[in-house]
């Protein structure tokens, strides 16, 4: 999986490329992150990438040409590597809310380019001419698109076969089956008078599977009822699931 990231702060991405699961995935060439600074595509001595907004108002607006020239550089790099360019994604508060399903969709693209906005906004003409999709991580505003881009890349990289130590880890994450994850426990067996549930200590696999499913249903019902409704609409709930939910 290849990511191309347009950012004024490429140094930020060392947190993703050098550490943890995502860092190992990059080391093993399961994923690659290519960083592109629009200032490198500016011809003026000051490397100007922003200007005042027409019509007035606070803040500066990222200019069209440096961004378009950067995108042209990305596409030229793809052509030289013999790969087809994937979608261009702008990180923006008005974008579609990122989800596990979108992470799975992105993985299927093979490559994706992120545009990390800064300042007040990105010139709309760049958006109209170049952007295929806009994504957000929530109804709040950050200083730029770098943190959302890293969060999304982390979610996608986890899905790459071989990226996780345990092949089942990703499939058992929250949201993969439409529900929240079940509780997890490790040693010691008793801590401050709090014990690990007996069913997890008995070694009966079928009972453990049932307990985990019920706990997943219970947590989702209490914390994210909207996910229960969505799972029901998609046919992800069994008759036994529905019977258990009625008992809550």
From Swiss-Prot:
GO terms for biological process: tRNA N1-guanine methylation. Its EC number is 2.1.1.228. It catalyses: guanosine(37) in tRNA + S-adenosyl-L-methionine = N(1)-methylguanosine(37) in tRNA + S-adenosyl-L-homocysteine + H(+). Keywords: Cytoplasm, Methyltransferase, S-adenosyl-L-methionine, Transferase, tRNA processing. The keyword Iron-sulfur does not apply. The keyword Methyltransferase applies. Pfam families: tRNA_m1G_MT (PF01746). It comes from the Bacteria. InterPro entries: Alpha/beta_knot_MTases (IPR029028), tRNA_m1G_MeTrfase_C_sf (IPR023148), tRNA_m1G_MeTrfase_TrmD (IPR002649), tRNA_m1G_MTases_N (IPR029026), tRNA_MeTrfase_TRMD/TRM10 (IPR016009). It is found in: Cytoplasm. GO terms for molecular function: tRNA (guanine(37)-N1)-methyltransferase activity. S-adenosyl-L-methionine binds at residues 117, 137-142. One of its GO terms (cellular component) is cytosol. Its main location: cytoplasm. Belongs to the RNA methyltransferase TrmD family. Homodimer. Specifically methylates guanosine-37 in various tRNAs. This is tRNA (guanine-N(1)-)-methyltransferase. The gene is trmD.
